[in-house]
């Protein structure tokens, strides 16, 4: 009995450890490293999120940014994530937060995803990924706000920068 309990606990602890901090297959520069809640909220504040917004989180991990956007600001949220285990975790988190009717999580490639509905796009992605995403982000509707946790987009200076504890968050507005 004790062996079964230890084995079960070991497996339960191993799954999140396997997801967290490991590169996804075929994507050596994409890691799941969750944004702290305080930083996620500061990102949404910097973007000026309201109930009229549709917040897309690229590489949404456990879904915390769309969930906070829905819970605290009344916005609709969309998480785009390639890892099906994290999508399942996101739906569980949304149900726990009682905002599953205001958010969606889809398995998708952020380079192929349709972002046309977004009024706010958030990301915590490496500089190389941000650089590759830049043309897609620049093509969004004028006025769309893009907020990055920590990473810049080379050649596109942010409109605002804000320090939150040890992290920097950056805001761009798609020009007209």
Give a label for each model feature.
Residues 63-67:
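Glycine-rich SAM-binding Motif I of class I
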Residues 3, 18-53, 84-117:
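S-adenosyl-L-methionine
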Residues 6-16:
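Bacterial N-terminal signal peptides
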Residues 116-132:
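A short SAM/SAH-binding and catalytic strip from SAM-dependent methyltransferases
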Residues 52-61:
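Conserved class I S-adenosyl-L-methionine
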Residues 76-81:
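Conserved SAM-binding motif I beta-strand of class I
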Residues 128-176:
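C-terminal substrate-binding/active-site "lid" region of AdoMet-derived donor-dependent transferases
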């Amino acid at each position: 009995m004790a062996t079964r309990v230890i084995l079960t606990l070991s497996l339960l602890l191993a799954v999140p450890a396997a997801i967290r901090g490991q590169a996804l297959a075929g994507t050596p520069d994409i890691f799941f490293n969750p944004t702290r809640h305080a930083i996620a909220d500061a990102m949404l504040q910097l973007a000026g999120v309201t109930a009229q917004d549709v917040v897309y989180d690229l590489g949404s991990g456990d879904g915390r940014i769309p969930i906070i956007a829905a819970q605290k600001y009344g916005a609709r949220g969309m998480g785009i994530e390639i890892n099906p285990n994290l999508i399942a975790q996101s739906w569980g988190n949304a149900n726990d937060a009682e905002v599953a009717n205001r958010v969606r999580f889809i398995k998708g490639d952020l380079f192929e995803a349709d972002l046309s509905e977004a009024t706010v796009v958030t990301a915590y992605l490496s500089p190389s990924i941000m650089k590759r995403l830049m043309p897609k982000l620049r093509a969004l509707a004028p006025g769309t706000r893009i907020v990055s946790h920590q990473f810049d987009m080379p050649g596109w200076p942010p409109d605002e920068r804000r320090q939150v504890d040890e992290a920097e968050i950056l805001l761009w507005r798609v020009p007209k």
